[in-house]
């Protein structure tokens, strides 16, 4: 059998999920403490990029798009990420702020999905975070007109060296086209893999100022 033939056998790739379950008595009254516990466990397990999350948006035709970004802050007000404001996702959020986030912690047989509304961060919040980044990352933010078409990587590298020279003295200024978003938590779903595909799913949903918790069928 050729390598290509083996690749075509993906329908037979499967495994049992045996790392544990999630029961109602394990659940706090609000979702954030459980999210924080799972995130801490993902970090402690040395997962690659435990703060990586998929951000799903839609364009004006209803076409969905997904990409991975890094979570940079979270609290009761929502989950925060930063991006180029000229990017496709930023334009789509401007037209439709309803987004979905997904944390795929495969090695722990866990997923967390968030549904909420994205809102722009204040300039003060963005400036504070921007200047906490490594200096080369600050310069890199100036280089790319995100999602635009370019003919070669060399264009980016040349621009980076040019701007590194330009900003060699003093602080790198915040680009006017760079910012961040906070995604409110309207729903948060926790998924824990289970044996025989009997996975555990619990959905937290805001209900008149409180949190309603439902178990969902896998």
From Swiss-Prot:
Pfam families tied to this protein: PNP_phzG_C, PNPOx_N
Pathway info: Cofactor metabolism; pyridoxal 5'-phosphate salvage; pyridoxal 5'-phosphate from pyridoxamine 5'-phosphate: step 1/1; Cofactor metabolism; pyridoxal 5'-phosphate salvage; pyridoxal 5'-phosphate from pyridoxine 5'-phosphate: step 1/1
Annotated PROSITE patterns: PYRIDOX_OXIDASE
EC category: oxidoreductase
Binding residues annotated for FMN, in chain numbering: 67-72, 82-83, 88-89, 111, 146-147, 191, 201
Cofactor: how and how many bound: Binds 1 FMN per subunit.
GO MF, one annotated term: FMN binding
Sites where the protein binds substrate: 14-17, 72, 129, 133, 137, 197-199
Protein's UniProt keywords contain Oxidoreductase: yes
Known EC number: 1.4.3.5
Gene Ontology biological-process entries: pyridoxine biosynthetic process
Function: Catalyzes the oxidation of either pyridoxine 5'-phosphate (PNP) or pyridoxamine 5'-phosphate (PMP) into pyridoxal 5'-phosphate (PLP).
Self-association state and partner proteins as the record states: Homodimer.
HAMAP family: PdxH (MF_01629)
Protein name: Pyridoxine/pyridoxamine 5'-phosphate oxidase
The organism of origin for this protein: Klebsiella pneumoniae subsp. pneumoniae (strain ATCC 700721 / MGH 78578)
Gene transcribed to yield this protein: pdxH
């Amino acid at each position: 059998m050729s390598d290509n033939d083996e690749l075509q056998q993906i329908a037979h790739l499967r495994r049992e999920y045996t790392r544990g379950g999630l029961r109602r008595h394990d659940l706090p009254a609000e979702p954030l403490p459980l999210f924080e516990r799972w995130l801490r466990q993902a970090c402690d397990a040395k997962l690659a990029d435990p703060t990586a999350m998929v951000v799903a948006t839609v364009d004006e035709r209803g076409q969905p798009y997904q990409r991975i970004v890094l979570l940079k802050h979270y609290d009761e007000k929502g989950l925060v990420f930063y991006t180029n404001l000229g990017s496709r996702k930023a334009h789509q959020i401007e037209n439709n702020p309803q987004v979905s986030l997904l944390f795929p912690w495969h090695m722990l047989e866990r997923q967390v999905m968030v549904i909420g509304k994205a809102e722009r961060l204040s300039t003060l919040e963005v400036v504070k975070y921007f200047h906490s980044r490594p200096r080369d990352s600050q310069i890199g933010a100036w280089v790319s007109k995100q999602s635009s078409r370019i003919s070669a990587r060399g264009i980016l590298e040349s621009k980076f060296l040019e701007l590194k020279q330009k900003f060699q003295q003093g602080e790198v200024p915040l680009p006017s086209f760079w910012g961040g978003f906070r995604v409110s938590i309207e729903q948060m779903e926790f998924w824990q893999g289970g044996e025989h595909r009997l996975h555990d799913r619990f959905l937290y949903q805001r209900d008149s100022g409180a949190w309603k918790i439902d178990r969902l069928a896998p």
